[in-house]
Amino acid sequence: MNVPASAREQSTDEIYRLVRAAAVQHRPITALYDGTRRLLCPHVVGYNRPGDWRVFCYQYGGETKDGPLPVSGGGIWRCLALIKLSSAECVTGPWRTEPHAPQRCGEHIEVDADDYPGADPQNGQ
């Protein structure tokens, strides 16, 4: 019997594949990060000099370590350690983004959502 990924422990490889696919397909995800629920749009997946996987993402909902994300209508750009993500799954909803400074999250980039403009499910809307 297959158990849904969200109902069991996910490996780092499974989470990497899900986050990478979400970036390529411009799909939002939900995940726990250090035990707090986050709603994220992963934009860049890569690793830093020590080889630690990182996700540069736009957090548009959920919690932060300091409490709920402010209800200002906008989100926050985050650089998250992939190894700290758990219970990750794609969710239905619009791809969210806003202008940002050049990312310094990952030194070696594996995937950048900007390289896949045709994947936007909103067709640029």
Enumerate the language-model features and the residues they cover.
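Core beta-strand-centered patch of the WYL/Sm-like small regulatory domain
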Residues: 2-125
